[in-house]
């Protein structure tokens, strides 16, 4: 399977990734990692980072990942989705352990500077540094036909219902019912569509 890349595409080096590279660059991107599945109609723009780490990445038909976007870990994306510049989508777990994964349905629009991370740091023990207390993993689910506006943060464990709109700058800490418009910090339902 090969995917055409825009002129100017660059990949991190082994040193900047801190481990094995999952792809090799030539005229086309040749995916070598058995845990990365990108449909041939998907477009991966220059300077996007796609890295399954220990997980599995699946990107469906006609998806667009723009420059500066990061998709890593356990992430599944349906068809006809877009991830705009500088958005970060980080799933946790492995191909067999889905706790902490990010599941994105079809026809989802993710604007610039959106953050979805399937884990959060534990910081209950004051006698231990936070960085030694591990993370709590919870999956994030974005159902079909959702629009996530710019600079939104969706916390781990949240499900965004079908047809919902998340207003710019929102911090989503709770599940969003289908066909809802939410906004604010923390996000609250503004109206139904």
Give residue spans per PLM region.
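Short alpha-helical
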Residues: 77, 160, 171
């Amino acid at each position: 399977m090969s995917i055409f890349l825009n002129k100017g595409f660059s990949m991190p080096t082994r040193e900047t990734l801190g481990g094995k590279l999952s792809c090799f660059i030539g005229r086309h991107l040749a995916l070598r990692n058995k845990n990365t599945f990108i449909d041939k109609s998907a477009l991966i723009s220059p300077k996007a980072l796609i890295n399954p780490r220990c997980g599995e990445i699946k990107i469906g038909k006609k998806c667009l990942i723009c420059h500066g976007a990061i998709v890593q870990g356990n992430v599944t994306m349906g068809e006809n989705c877009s991830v705009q510049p500088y958005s970060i989508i980080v799933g946790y777990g492995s191909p067999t352990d889905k706790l902490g994964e990010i599941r994105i349905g079809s026809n989802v629009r993710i604007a610039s500077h959106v953050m979805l991370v399937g884990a959060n740091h534990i910081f209950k023990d004051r006698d231990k540094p936070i960085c030694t207390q591990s993370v709590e993993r919870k999956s994030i689910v974005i159902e079909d036909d959702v629009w996530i506006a710019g600079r939104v943060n969706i916390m781990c464990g949240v499900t965004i219902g079908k047809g919902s709109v998340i207003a710019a700058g929102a911090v989503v800490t709770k599940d969003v019912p289908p066909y809802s418009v939410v906004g604010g910090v923390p996000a609250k339902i503004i109206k139904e569509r």
